Regions:
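Active-site-proximal, well-structured secondary-structure segments within enzyme catalytic domains
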Residues: 42, 74, 81, 86-127, ...
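N-terminal helix-rich structural modules
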Residues: 1-106, 110
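Short His/Asp/Glu-rich catalytic/ion-coordination signatures at enzyme active sites or charged loops
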Residues: 1-4, 25-67, 125-166, 170, ...
Length: 250
């Protein structure tokens, strides 16, 4: 995959920036009024796709865009590789069986098998992979375990040798260059131009219409969880790593 994806990206560039191919598409596009509605729609979409991918740029800018696209393809690969490596590197090792309180037997057995496969027979190992992560967040009575898992997941590839922070910075810079080459003020404008929202402001407005009631509902749920915790003598303030656990109880 590491070798194939940049090659695939380059192949796409060679196709969408091929002058002869685009001329054929443009000829049909310029005479699209004679087509059936579905044919006209298909031609318009093809034409727009080619333009969005640099078909109208001059030769020098096409080469620059190709270089940016190849850079982005490699950065995306690095980003995903860092995520995978960071995921595989994370583990929570439990040595005391009392800390497994609340967990289903299937989860405990899986953790024991994972420990055995890592040469730690007699212990339990939990990982960031969903079958291991989710039951722990939902059912583990040990709050410290839940906190470890939650923070490990939400800071994945945040620092260390698998940090994606420098990769993200490079992606942002490359996307900015790509948008500028294609005549957009920023990458957000480039992306929204091709969808129903059309502008970044419209997209943000739509997201906020969803976000505000969603946040309000979460506050209600957390209040219910806090009331449950208080009623059962749990001397805590509900934190993010408590959410799934108490959601199972209220």
């Amino acid at each position: 995959a590491e070798k194939f994806y940049p090659t695939y990206s380059q192949f796409g560039d060679e196709m969408t920036m091929n002058d002869a191919l685009f001329e054929r598409i443009k000829t049909v596009y310029d005479n699209r009024e004679s087509l059936e509605p579905d044919q006209r729609r298909a031609v318009e979409e093809y034409y727009k796709s080619f333009v969005r991918n640099g078909a109208l740029l001059d030769a020098d800018k096409k080469e620059e865009l190709k270089a940016v696209n190849t850079e982005l393809a490699n950065l995306y690969l690095t980003f995903n590789k860092n995520l995978l490596n960071a995921t595989n590197a994370f583990e929570i090792v439990v040595e005391d069986s009392t800390r497994l309180s609340g967990l289903p037997q299937s989860s405990i057995a899986q953790a024991a098998d994972e420990a055995k496969s890592r040469g730690m027979e007699g212990k339990w190992v939990f990982t960031l992979h969903a079958p291991s992560r989710l039951p722990l967040l939902q059912y583990a009575d040990d709050r410290d375990l839940r906190q470890q898992m939650y923070q490990g997941y939400t800071t994945l590839a945040f620092d260390g040798e698998n940090s994606n922070q420098p990769v993200i910075n490079k992606i942002l810079q490359a996307r900015t260059r790509k948008a500028a080459l294609l005549g957009f003020k920023d990458y957000g404008s480039y992306m929204t131009d091709n969808v129903m929202a059309k502008t970044v402001d419209n997209a943000e407005e739509l997201l906020m219409k969803i976000w505000r009631p969603a946040v309000a509902r979460v506050h209600e749920e957390v209040a219910e969880m806090q009331a449950y915790a208080n009623a059962h003598g749990d001397n805590i303030t509900i934190a993010p790593w408590d959410y799934y656990y108490y959601a199972e109880k209220v």
